[in-house]
């Protein structure tokens, strides 16, 4: 990014701190800020992943999606359910940043007080409020995985599949051990 002339600003320890600072910079300098997940147009674009999955595997039973703020999961779950309501969408979060699980259990957008995960791409304290109704309607289940499971999944993907996947993307791989998918067609979205 710097090579294109942009000034890179690293701020805070979790997404929520960086996002608040980005809004301040946008206001101060007149920048345009496009939220990376709490934006229905961004989430709609991410829904194209569901189209690709269903095109390649029309009989898919489960789609596992990593969750930070919920944009990717909103897009994938909403479009998947629109195209085939029988598809089960499983959201997967780090145990140390389970803001969607907390919010779904509370029935409203909830902020978790502490983040503790190696999955920094999903280290979000609060899911997107614009997205939450779609997540409530379209996510069938939430699984949380801990950092040790992510580490084992990283090693498995590297050693057995020759793929290097960052920790947020590995959430769905680690989650495979949590449910019995025998005889089912399952897609794990590797994205963070």
Predicted regions and their residues:
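PLP-dependent amino-acid enzyme catalytic core
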Residues: 1-191
């Amino acid at each position: 990014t710097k090579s294109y002339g942009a000034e890179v600003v690293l701020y805070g320890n979790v997404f929520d701190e960086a996002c608040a600072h980005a809004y301040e910079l946008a206001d101060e300098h007149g920048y345009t800020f496009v939220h990376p997940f709490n934006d229905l147009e961004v989430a709609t674009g991410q829904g194209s992943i569901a189209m690709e999955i269903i095109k390649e595997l029309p009989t898919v039973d489960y789609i596992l999606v990593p969750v930070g703020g919920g944009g990717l999961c909103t897009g994938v779950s909403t479009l998947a359910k629109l195209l085939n309501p029988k598809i089960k969408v499983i959201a997967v979060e780090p145990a140390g940043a389970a803001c969607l699980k907390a919010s779904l259990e509370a029935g409203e957008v909830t902020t978790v007080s502490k983040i503790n995960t190696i999955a920094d791409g999903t280290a979000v304290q609060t899911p997107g409020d614009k997205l939450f109704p779609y997540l409530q309607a379209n996510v069938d289940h939430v699984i949380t995985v801990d950092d040790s499971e992510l580490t084992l999944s990283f090693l498995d993907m590297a050693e057995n599949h020759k793929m290097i996947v960052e920790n947020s993307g590995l959430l769905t791989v680690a989650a495979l051990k949590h449910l019995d998918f025998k005889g089912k067609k399952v897609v794990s979205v590797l994205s963070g």
